[in-house]
From Swiss-Prot:
Organism: Azoarcus sp. (strain BH72)
Residue stretches in coiled coil: none
Protein name in UniProt: 3-deoxy-manno-octulosonate cytidylyltransferase
Gene3D superfamilies in alphabetical order: Spore Coat Polysaccharide Biosynthesis Protein SpsA, Chain A
Source organism superkingdom: Bacteria
GO biological process, one term: CMP-keto-3-deoxy-D-manno-octulosonic acid biosynthetic process
Length: 257
């Protein structure tokens, strides 16, 4: 496939875990752990996008490249668009947005999502999803679900249980079990974008469904852009949102030392 780039957004002001990008993981800041992890994805360039001088200093000390961005972006996609414009990337270039709180991310998934977008010339975005096997996850509004068409393009993303098993879930008491064969997919928040789309995204009006669901990818779908979905066999390693998550990741790195 053609070359692609990686951008790692790193916001210092996390509501649940303040200062998260600089949290220590086995002697290195988390953002540096993520930076090291993605090197094996085969990207032409890797950049960290931040609005915090401490994060910039940590990345530069580790030999990484940094773009300083505005602090008031309404979404990660807007921040990515600023980076693409600042660095003068071309419309046909592909950029993968890797969250700065995923020090255990599998580089192969990053490569695969970029390849998925490169292979579908009609898609503006590519992302990933994996099967859900637990009914509690299906009915959890914090778990985003996606339904795809025959070409592995997203039909809709929702916090609601989709697709709905009408007959199997006719009664509330029957919803504790997933019907065999029900294709429920959990969305994974990893995105590849064409730069041409990023340039247009910032001018797109917010969509009603985006605002109701609080899912920014629905803005693209509302305005007619296609999203390709890479199917994963299993859930990837979880990111760091809480102190408990941070301790779990620290234990993994301690065990690998």
């Amino acid at each position: 496939m053609s070359a692609f780039r990686i951008v790692i957004p790193a916001r210092f002001a996390s509501s649940r875990l303040p200062g998260k990008p600089l949290a220590d993981i086995a002697g290195k800041p988390m953002i540096v752990r993520v930076l090291e992890r993605v090197q094996d994805a085969g990207a032409a360039e890797v950049w960290v996008a931040t609005d915090h001088d401490g994060v910039r200093e940590a990345v530069e000390a580790a030999g990484g490249k940094v773009v300083m961005t505005r602090a008031d972006h309404p979404s990660g996609t807007d921040r990515l668009a600023e980076v693409a414009c600042a660095l003068g990337w071309q419309d046909e270039d592909i950029v993968v947005n890797v969250q700065g709180d995923e020090p255990l991310i599998d580089p192969a998934i990053i490569t695969a999502v970029a390849a998925e977008l490169a292979a579908d010339g009609e898609a503006a975005i590519a992302t990933a999803a994996h099967p859900i096997h637990d009914a509690d996850e299906v009915f959890n509004p914090n778990v985003v679900k996606v339904v795809c068409d025959a070409r592995q393009r997203a039909l809709y993303f929702s916090r609601a249980p989709i697709p709905w098993a009408r007959d199997a879930w006719a009664q509330p008491g029957e919803r504790a079990v997933l019907p065999a064969g029900l294709p429920v997919l959990r969305h994974v928040g990893l995105y590849a974008y064409r730069v041409s789309f990023l340039r247009r995204y910032t001018a797109l009006a917010p969509a009603p469904i985006e605002q109701w669901e609080a899912l920014e990818q629905l803005r693209a779908m509302w305005h007619g852009y296609r999203i390709r979905v890479l199917g994963l066999q299993a859930a990837p390693a979880a990111g760091v949102d809480t102190v408990e998550d941070l301790e779990r990741v620290r234990a993994v790195f301690a065990g690998a030392a």
